[in-house]
């Protein structure tokens, strides 16, 4: 049985997350509390914990270091609970920090359970990378969701040598991201590079054709 306090202990003591940041993320991201009734017993818990009971992670915000640390802690915790049972990540994200997003991506690939991804609303930029990185055959999008890929954004200032160093790093990141998308979508690298030169928006059906998702969901299977 999932204990909502166990994840908090795992994240703060084992992973080293700030308790203040973790509580703030939980309280700001989702409806605070629900009442769960089972076999004549009633308990109050936050939606964050209730979803975790069903091995569901909800990423509904921009991706930064704080968010990535919490998502990674959830993935690692759920693997420790059951290394064979699937984990689902629901995505409605405009993207965000590339380094933070790549940290989530690497954790998704590293852990034993399959990670299914579901786009609800929008998966743009780094969000699109995470969407397509789900386990093959388990990447889905709701009917009216949107997926967008583009080249990483960045800027530099200072001495010419500093600008050159930053430029080289951005080019490395761009190649890494395009390689990831090409690998999971089965598209040619050149096509991904060409399409990502500017914002490339896709409907859910177009994302399926492109290889970003495997299925478009209209109604949840009974």
Locate each region found by the language model.
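Terminal-region recognition feature
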Residues: 1-222
